[in-house]
UniProtKB/Swiss-Prot annotation:
It comes from Alkaliphilus metalliredigens (strain QYMF). Residues 137-140 are annotated as: G4. Residues 10-206 form the tr-type G domain. Its EC number is 3.6.5.3. The keyword Phosphoprotein does not apply. This is Elongation factor Tu 1.
Length: 397
């Protein structure tokens, strides 16, 4: 039996379920796979306990349990992540282990919004999950129409509070458990309705090749008579020979350079694109003027910064993290892309200290500027070991 060929005829979208513990995220994930399998004959039906026993993965030195399922609608191919525990969600969203183009917020109609409902919406805002669709679950347990409307209003208010368009967000009322029991019935229709909403509300993500060019510099050589070569893996976009690009980071202002060649596996190319490991030949710069930790990028697309707000997860002792809390003014190394930069942290007002296992919003100031933008992931390290993970939430300067 040969491996089934992966058909990439439909647009691909990454989504995930978020929401409070026991509100039905995993049941909904199982119900989606079964309903989609029944209605469209695509993907495999995945049972609840298979999703619940999610395998552990390591991302940036942090162990996270995540379940991955995939399925298709008429219009799209979806890769869907579901996490068993709240801590896994926090870690997953902050490390970007499972990048989401949009999320399904699952909220129990019987309980209404709970603390983790709020926290997952806040995390989505902080880490840059751009779109949320709401599934009000367990509606079979609520007879009172007014109560359903009340819960819907509460969820919409919560979305508005964290700068999501709460008034316009699609809210689907259903029952994951009932859909699981009878995917062909009326509760199964609600799953289809959910995906009609997702197909339209969550836009197709911009492909990596369509984004502005960026390549973190990993190594630098000089080739006699030809100039300086910077090597690395192109993170996004396309770079062409004779194009003007900028060198950003570790100095106050970006420096403009001209690409005189792109090499891959010792062959000369006209261009390099996202995912390629290349050497970029640069005119007008000496080997000692460019170093690991800087990035080559489309001019004007990214700037060097030293100060920003970040959402951070601090590793527990069992995860190889610190055994003790840290305080305001803590000075670790921040590992961005390819290099460590020292910086200091400022805790929010009223927060005395941060314990291992916490997640928190903090202000970070680096001693040298790094090419930074919202959504950029980093690790926090002490003496070469990872003690935390973070994501840039907003730039200060």
């Amino acid at each position: 039996m040969g491996k089934a060929k992966f058909e990439r005829s439909k647009p691909h979208v990454n989504i995930g379920t978020i929401g409070h513990v026991d509100h039905g995220k995993t049941t909904l994930t199982a119900a989606i796979t079964i309903t989609m399998h029944n209605r469209y004959g695509t993907g495999g039906a995945v049972a609840f306990d298979m999703i619940d026993k999610a395998p552990e993965e390591r991302e940036r030195g942090i162990t996270i349990s995540t379940a991955h399922v995939e399925y298709e609608t008429d219009k799209r191919h979806y890769a869907h992540v579901d996490c068993p525990g709240h801590a896994d969600y926090v870690k997953n969203m902050i490390t970007g282990a499972a990048q989401m183009d949009g999320a399904i917020l699952v909220c129990s109609a019987a309980d209404g919004p709970m603390p983790q409902t709020r926290e997952h919406i806040l995390l989505s805002r902080q880490v840059g999950v751009p779109y949320i669709v709401v599934f009000l679950n367990k509606c079979d347990m609520v007879d009172d129409e007014e109560l359903l409307e009340l819960v819907e209003m509460e969820v919409r208010d919560l979305l508005n509070m964290y700068e999501f368009p709460g008034d316009d967000t699609p809210v689907i009322m259903g029952s994951a458990l009932k859909a699981l029991e009878d995917p062909a019935g009326p509760w199964g229709d609600k799953i289809v309705e959910l995906f009609d909403a997702i197909d339209t509300w969550i836009p197709e993500p911009v492909r990596d090749t369509d984004k502005p060019f960026l390549m973190p510099v990993e190594d630098v050589f000089s080739i006699t008579g030809r100039g300086t070569v910077a090597t690395g893996r192109i993170e996004r976009g396309i770079v062409k020979v004779q194009e003007e690009i900028s060198l950003v980071g570790l100095s106050e202002a970006p420096r403009k350079l001209v690409v005189t060649g792109v090499e891959m596996f010792r062959k000369l190319l006209d261009q390099g694109q996202a995912g390629d490991n290349v050497g970029i030949l640069l005119r007008g710069i000496q080997r000692d003027e460019i170093e690991r930790g800087q990035v080559l990028a489309k001019t004007g697309s990214i700037q060097p910064h030293t100060k920003f707000m970040a959402e951070v997860y601090v590793l527990k002792k069992e995860e190889g993290g610190r055994h003790t809390p840290f305080f305001d003014g803590y000075r670790p190394q921040f590992y961005f892309r390819t290099t460590d930069v020292t910086g200091s942290i400022k805790l929010p007002e009223g927060v005395e200290m941060v314990m291992p296992g916490d997640n928190i919003t903090m202000e970070i100031e680096l001693i040298s500027p790094i090419a930074t933008e919202e959504g950029l992931r980093f690790a926090i390290r002490e003496g070469g070991r990872t003690v935390g993970a973070g994501v840039v939430a907003s730039i200060i300067e």
